[in-house]
């Protein structure tokens, strides 16, 4: 599947929640750093593996990740404060399953929702984001469309 090919090329795989079945995590390429959070559809098995939120730094870029985040300027409760207190340069969330990237000029933070690669949800097109992190910057950001939700062989 194309999603696995893209993940194989990446240094790290990030998942913004709604894994669904914990066995999905076993389909990800072995030996890759997985950074992820659980989503509102995830059960106890997923919650044992993934936290509700993450703060981390890669290549000088501070990242904050949670599943339910809202979007600029209407973030979910407490998210704006967490972005400020963590000094995150990138905020990654899921929940809507709709791909959206926007620079929040007020918070000086890049908002990223990769959409969804799965077949379940309201998203018409399955998407993921690829990008590079180096010297404190996000570069080479691109949206990968994996086909229509529900399409066989996509």
Labelled PLM ranges:
Residues 1-34, 42-52, 60, 124-127, ...:
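N-terminal active-site segment of His-dependent metallophosphoesterases
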Residues 13, 18, 28, 39, ...:
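Divalent metal-coordination and catalytic microenvironments
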Residues 35-77, 81:
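Helix-adjacent hinge/juxtasegments
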Residues 40, 69-71, 117, 134, ...:
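Short, solvent-exposed coil/turn elements at secondary-structure transition points
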Residues 15, 57-58, 103, 133:
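Generic beta-strand structural signal
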Residues 141-153:
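Short, solvent-exposed aromatic-acidic interface loops
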Residues 35, 73-137, 141:
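Conserved beta-sheet core of the metallophosphoesterase superfamily
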Residues 1-5, 24-27, 53-54, 79-82, ...:
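Short, flexible, glycine/charge-rich loop motifs used to bind or transfer phosphoryl groups or to couple energy/partner
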């Amino acid at each position: 599947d194309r999603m696995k090919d893209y993940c194989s090329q990446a240094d790290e795989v990030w998942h913004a929640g709604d894994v669904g079945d914990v066995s999905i995590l076993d389909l990800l390429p072995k030996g890759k750093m997985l950074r992820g959070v659980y989503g509102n559809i995830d059960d106890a098995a997923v919650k044992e593996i993934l936290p509700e939120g993450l703060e981390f730094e890669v290549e000088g870029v501070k990242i904050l990740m949670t599943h339910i985040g809202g979007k600029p300027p209407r973030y979910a409760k407490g998210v704006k404060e967490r972005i400020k207190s963590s000094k995150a340069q990138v905020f990654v969330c899921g929940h809507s399953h709709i791909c959206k990237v926007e620079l929040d000029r007020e918070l000086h933070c890049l908002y990223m929702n990769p959409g969804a690669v799965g077949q379940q949800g309201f998203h018409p097109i399955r998407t993921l984001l690829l990008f590079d992190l180096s010297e404190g910057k996000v570069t080479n950001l691109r949206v990968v469309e994996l086909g229509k939700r529900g399409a066989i062989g996509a």
